[in-house]
Amino acid sequence: VYDVAIIGAGITGCAIAYELGKYNVKAVIVEKENDVSVGTTKANSAIIHGGYDPKPGTKMAEYNIKGNVYTKELCEKLDVPYKQIGALVVAFSEEEKKTLEELKQRGITNGVPDMEIWDKEKLLKEEPNLSDKAVAALSSPNVGIVSPWELALALAETAVLNGVEVKLNTEVSGIEKENDTYKIETNNGVIEAKYICNAAGVFADKVNEMCNEKTFEITPNKGEYYLMDKSQGNLVNHVIFQCPNEKGKGVLVAPTVHGNLIVGPDSQPSAANDVSTTKQGLDFVRNTALKSVPGINFRESIRNFAGVRARTADHDFHIYEDKNNKGFINIAGMQSPGLSSACAIAPDILKMLENSGLTLEAKEDIVDERHIDRFKHLSHEDRAKLVEKNPAFGKIICRCETITEGEIINAVHRPIPATSIDAVKRRCNAGMGRCQGGFCGPRVQEIIARELNKPLADIPQDRLGTNIITGETKDGGAK
């Protein structure tokens, strides 16, 4: 019997697992996909928000502010790409200037530091590629950009090194309570746990209703994006927002930590698993973004993608212990600023577990930092040392991103192994560049198959079932 079962291995579930790993607790993450961070966590704007947007007094406001600080600390400690570049909310009319004042006041109430309203002159000096129709902007220098999947992986891997188990390809189909123990039915048998943390993202309402009365409903909301080549990465220096509206923070234009430019999202109701992109959605994103930054060359787009947000009617996080089922804790409605808030929510979940009866006895010895060898960021001297120690680091596999065979082998053998081409991409960036794996994809697939001692046909692109190869032609071809 586990002490705690965490359902869902997105950023929220991984953050809770990371915190639980510091204590003598038997914990497990249960995830239906074949890797962590493959839902909303891998498909969002990758922004650590400032905290001026949420309504004062909400859980969003509280945790966004705390998370803005704590997430940065964790990224430094766990070697996760993060840059504090600040954000600008741009106004294009006198009416929108009033919105900037309202946002600034809201930010002051929430505790956001160092905000300023810039006039047109200062704005265009700092951001020369902005539209000259911009009249003013709210500056929030505490805003950061991050690699969301690398953060979730860092938290989950550290948790694993500290004794937390991860069960992938394990889908929850039912939950029953017997005495003080929850019996979680899955496609891989029954998992027993004294406490449940429901961090199931867009499916959190369904998981909640397996055991509890319906207390909230998630309305999945899809957002579509462009990812631009690095040739566009220096167009803006800050995260550029337009004034928010009832649909959310609107279409942003921002650098990424890897040097690209991200543009999006729109906002439309969708099915929970609908990550398709549409001409209508992408046209809207493109036309709206060009109002802010008219010089974006959309011919330099290297990928389109969509992510689904877990929206709730009251636009706030639902973080509470069920009143009828002791030890069942919901962490739901984790829409924006969910990524910014998750790391700060996790320590409070541990307090809730403790108040519900879980004994938290700190471990004497834990892993709480990590280092990743990123070949392209090393000096020539350090590269030479690494190649001498391990010749696989002297062989470039992904030319676009300068990723070596050594990095790919390391990705396959990390605490949560990479078993698909995209799982390697999330761990070391192979396949993230201009050709999107067109050149290195087959070579990465061969390395994974070799390292895991599996047939090449068993290595998928991403999720289970996304197989690329059906068999060897000389062996009779397709199975």
Locations of regions flagged by a protein language model:
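Iron-sulfur (Fe-S) cluster-binding segments and ferredoxin-like electron-carrier domains
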Residues: 404-415, 438-456
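N-terminal Rossmann-like FAD-binding beta1-loop-alpha1 element of flavoenzymes
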Residues: 2-29
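C-terminal catalytic lobe of FAD-dependent flavoproteins
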Residues: 248, 257-258, 273-396, 403-414, ...
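Flavin-dependent oxidoreductases
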Residues: 15, 175-180, 184-264, 268-278, ...
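Helical element adjacent to the flavin cofactor pocket in flavoenzyme catalytic cores
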Residues: 138-195
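Short beta-strand to alpha-helix junction loop
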Residues: 62-65, 90-99, 138-157, 275-280, ...
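Glycine-rich FAD pyrophosphate-binding loop
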Residues: 22-42
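Dinucleotide-binding Rossmann-like beta1-alpha1 core, especially the glycine-rich loop
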Residues: 46-126, 250-251
